[in-house]
Amino acid sequence: MAGCPKGSWKPRLRSVVLGAAQLIWLSALISELVNRKKVATWTYNYSTKAYSWNNSRAFCKRHFTDLVAIQNKNEIAHLNDVIPYVNSYYWIGIRKINNKWTWVGTNKTLTAEAENWADNEPNNKRNNQDCVEIYIKSNSAPGKWNDEPCFKRKRALCYTASCQDMSCNSQGERIETIGSYTCSCYPGFYGPECEYVQECGKFDIPQHVLMNCSHPLGDFSFSSQCTFSCPEGYDLNGPSEMQCLASGIWTNNPPQCKAVQCQSLEAPLHGTMDCTHPLAAFAYDSSCKFECQPGYRMRGSDILHCTDSGQWSEPLPTCEAIACEPLESPLHGSMDCFPSTGAFGYNSSCTFRCTEGFVLMGNDAIHCADLGQWTAPAPVCEALQCQEFPVPSKAQVSCSDPFGPLKYQSACSFSCDEGSLLVGASVIRCLATGHWSEAPPECQAVSCTPLLSPENGTMTCIQPLGHSNYKSTCQFMCDEGFYLSGPERLDCSPSGHWTGSPPMCEAIKCPEIFAPEQGSLDCSHVHGEFSVGSTCHFSCNEEFELLGSRNVECTVSGRWSAPPPTCKGVTSLPVPSVRCPALTTPGQGTMSCRHHLESFGPNTTCYFGCKTGFTLRGANSLRCGASGQWTAVTPVCRAVKCSELHMDTAVAMNCSNPWGNFSYGSTCAFHCPEGQSLNGSARTTCGEDGHWSDAMPTCQAGTLTIQEALTYLGGALASTSGLAVGGTLLALLRKRLRKKDDGKCPLNPHSHLGTYGVFTNAAYDPTP
């Protein structure tokens, strides 16, 4: 055990006898039979079964401390004396780790002094002998060690330690002896139980020094650490930190703070200097003011300060003879000065002029005045400006401007947008006269041949660039009863041609019809033979009767308004013996019937449909049979259903259901109890697609509930002075809590939304 160094083993032989009486009692506590031998403050244990080395160590750690750790010859002799002999011998707590024999309990390498190998051991047969056994009561090598493969099964030799974790105040190492222990204190601690900490003592803090200390073990004691710093404008001279060592001595002496020093200054030539030094000469916070003699001016700052970085706030100024700023010839121009020494001193004068294509901006002559300023700013030569021109419509302009936008030597290139043609010069230049070499060109749109609306149709055009010009788009539609023959849309392309030929509107045709047998046909055609608008009149020969419509018309759907009639002899007119019951249009639906002989007679066929929001239940067509019965039951139209709304305990719901509960057209309104607010939409409607227009809302509590008001009321009622206030609040709460009873009752599905109440979700469905 790492925290329990062992003491002398010589006096422990006797104590084994005292501990032997405990073996029988302990064996009943362990599921696997275990025998123990005690020696003073350690107990040795061994298993009665054989295990591999890993399982043996697991056995020891589960029941005791670990496999035994042997560190001297006396311990080996004692174990060989008290532990019984078994032919498989015992595993001990040594194993080869990283090719070194190691005590597994402490993870320390086996020292040469502690080795107790048998002769010619360890030999590492087959390169897998990484664990160690002890020969207990061996005739040839009693108590000696041997390396063995770890998978072999041997008895586990264990020990139990009795050290206490808090011994020696956790500031030293406990050395156990028989029935007692001593403490070996760690550096910096002393005393029988290592209870005292070595002190270094306090020290004086020099002036201006800032100190911050930490004392983990006591003021100015072992492990105390102090850090030092200086205020702004001071440098630390000495160590920045000190530590109290285990010997009770500080690692260094305290440092000192010295004012930051700047470089010494002198008055400039032809000038004076006046300085103030609050701390030391030319040190932090010193300041110096400079002035120049008459006829000279100062170049630089007239006041300098010594900063905390040890640098002056500005460079040392100089005094120079009054002169004007040096001048240079203007770009694209020239300059002549007098005198020509180049000093630009007082009363110097300079004249300026510009090269061709440039004009002088400013005075052509300036003088250096007595204050060192020129009488006017130096002029500049600017390129002549050509007049700005408007960018032609549908044109792109790209200019190169070496001397500025639209100035001398500027060149502008023109190009036209797609669908436009350039008329004029493609490039114009700004000349030295300030005029353009050419007039700006124009872009004229490409035009296509104008189109006309087709006969019996219409044409709608979008012409962003002008009538029938490029990018014009024309859409064509035909009047009712006509269809488009050709493209529905034409575009004017950049080449000036339409993308196709103009379409035509042709009349919709109906199937050709003929005169009935024993009859005649007379037709008139407005838009062509048997086309939309054509009408035909039928008649029968004498002695024959017309059955069907006498007049039919070709409709826009391409069908005749009625089937062609027939002619039957008068004496042989059929008298139908049976008829089917007359049908009626279903509610919210449509019905269209075709009667073969007479209304609802044999072979009459009726077709059914429903309005928006309703679906057909049943067959969509019925035919009257020869027996006078329809082929199916008359269908009905049922409203589309939405999902059922489930009411929250707090939400009140009021619904109107014109076509059934939660069906198409149902509208539900929501409101919350007094004191709560609605979170969401206050109304939702069932749509034709079977979905609600809005999600169902919820109720959330307001800022003050009745219970909270009662809580606040309790404090007022608790005192005599609060009785009046409490009585008023109780009256208000009673009024608020009084259940409203205006003779209102739960609503049924047909209740109007304005009716007060709560929808009871009664079972209402008008369908059979």
Swiss-Prot record:
Q: Where in the cell is it found?
A: Cell membrane
Going by the UniProt record, its keywords in alphabetical order are: Calcium, Cell adhesion, Cell membrane, Disulfide bond, EGF-like domain, Glycoprotein, Lectin, Lipoprotein, Membrane, Metal-binding, Palmitate, Repeat, Signal, Sushi, Transmembrane, Transmembrane helix
- Give the record's glycosylation annotations as residue positions: 45, 54, 107, 212, 347, 456, 603, 654, 661, 679
Location of region: Interaction with SNX17 = 759-768
UniProt membrane topology term: Single-pass type I membrane protein
Q: Where is the lipid attached (S-stearoyl cysteine)?
A: 745
This protein's source sits in the domain of life called Eukaryota
Q: Where is this motif: Endocytosis signal?
A: 756-759
What PROSITE patterns does the database record attribute to this sequence?
C_TYPE_LECTIN_1, C_TYPE_LECTIN_2, EGF_1, EGF_2, EGF_3, SUSHI
- Report the residue ranges that make up the C-type lectin domain in this protein: 58-158
Where Ca(2+) is bound, by residue? Answer: 121, 123-124, 146-147
- Kindly list the GO CC terms recorded for this protein: external side of plasma membrane; extracellular space; membrane; plasma membrane; platelet alpha granule membrane
Residue ranges spanning the membrane: these are 710-733
Induced by what? By exposure to bacterial lipopolysaccharide (LPS).
Residue ranges of every copy of the Sushi domain listed in the record: 198-259, 260-321, 322-383, 384-445, 446-507, 508-569, 578-639, 640-701
- InterPro entries linked: C-type_lectin-like (IPR001304), C-type_lectin-like/link_sf (IPR016186), C-type_lectin_CS (IPR018378), Compl-Cell_Adhes-Reg (IPR050350), CTDL_fold (IPR016187), EGF-like_dom (IPR000742), Selectin_CTLD (IPR033991), Selectin_superfamily (IPR002396)
**What does the record say about domains?**
The C-type lectin domain is required for binding to integrins. Binding to soluble integrins alpha-V/beta-3 (ITGAV:ITGB3) and alpha-IIb/beta3 (ITGA2B:ITGB) is cation-dependent. Binds to the allosteric site (site 2) of integrins and activates them. The interaction with integrins may mediate cell-cell interactions and cell adhesion.
> Per its database record, what is this protein's job?
Ca(2+)-dependent receptor for myeloid cells that binds to carbohydrates on neutrophils and monocytes. Mediates the interaction of activated endothelial cells or platelets with leukocytes. The ligand recognized is sialyl-Lewis X. Mediates rapid rolling of leukocyte rolling over vascular surfaces during the initial steps in inflammation through interaction with SELPLG. Mediates cell-cell interactions and cell adhesion via the interaction with integrin alpha-IIb/beta3 (ITGA2B:ITGB3) and integrin alpha-V/beta-3 (ITGAV:ITGB3).
- Quaternary structure? Interacts with SNX17. Interacts with SELPLG/PSGL1 and PODXL2 and mediates neutrophil adhesion and leukocyte rolling. This interaction requires the sialyl-Lewis X epitope of SELPLG and PODXL2, and specific tyrosine sulfation on SELPLG. Interacts (via C-type lectin domain) with alpha-IIb/beta3 integrin ITGA2B:ITGB3 and alpha-V/beta-3 integrin ITGAV:ITGB3. Interacts with alpha5/beta1 integrin ITGA5:ITGB1 and alpha4/beta1 integrin ITGA4:ITGB.
Q: What is this protein called?
A: P-selectin
Q: Which organism is it from?
A: Rattus norvegicus
